[in-house]
Amino acid sequence: MAKPLYKRVLLKLSGEALAGEKGFGLDTDTINDIAHQISEITDMGVQVAIVVGGGNFWRGRTGEGMDRTTADYMGMMATVINALALQDALENIEILTRVQTAIEMRQIAEPYIRRRAVRHLEKNRVVIFAAGTGNPYFSTDTTAALRAAEIEAEVILLAKNVDGVYDSDPNINPNAQKLQELTYLDVLQQGLKVMDSTATSLCMDNKIPIKVFGLKQSQNIKKVILGEKIGTHIYS
């Protein structure tokens, strides 16, 4: 059996990924499929941390007429809903999981403590980071880059609704070309919509590679872990 390339990874899931084809809310079948994909790599001994977005319920920047700080905090609460849903799906298939939130809510999750998170990973528990960084004006992409640096993840697995990074929007331009490899500077200079510039810069500064791939295709998380050439590889 092929060996995984990585020992510890951070998986970034957008809120939209949890909504499935519905585009809003939570799709149980989609969440269960993601949980089974995660179980495939934990069974190989890979330590998995997850950052979830909240765009299937709310995006802070879309709160028209609303105070930006308030809107961002609402988005953080949406990520907690998603984290609990994913935790439930994982634990239903007997994957020990802990949710840690950047804003304390001890009745439902642990507060984020880096040492505790690392200890959970060492015990082969999945750790889900929710509520972003706990601060407004920072995206969940930036949270993923920050947490990956803090827990010393070897790679960020950026699961998207498209199968990689394209030179233009493939939903608009049928001739859009998928890019197999990019540097962080390519992403920043070309304005490619991978992560926001803060998150990309943080990955560049800490030399954390990023694998961008489609989540819709079955077993793609496992394929990336085993080194199959899918999606887009971003590196220094």
From Swiss-Prot:
Domain of life the protein comes from: Bacteria
GO BP annotations, alphabetical order: 'de novo' CTP biosynthetic process; UDP biosynthetic process
Pathway, per record: Pyrimidine metabolism; CTP biosynthesis via de novo pathway; UDP from UMP (UMPK route): step 1/1
Residues holding UMP: 54, 72, 133-140
EC number: 2.7.4.22
Keyword Transferase on entry: yes
Pfam families: AA_kinase
The keyword Transferase is assigned to this record: yes
Subunit structure of this chain's protein: Homohexamer.
Protein name per Swiss-Prot or TrEMBL: Uridylate kinase
Taxonomic lineage of the native organism: Bacteria, Bacillati, Bacillota, Clostridia, Peptostreptococcales
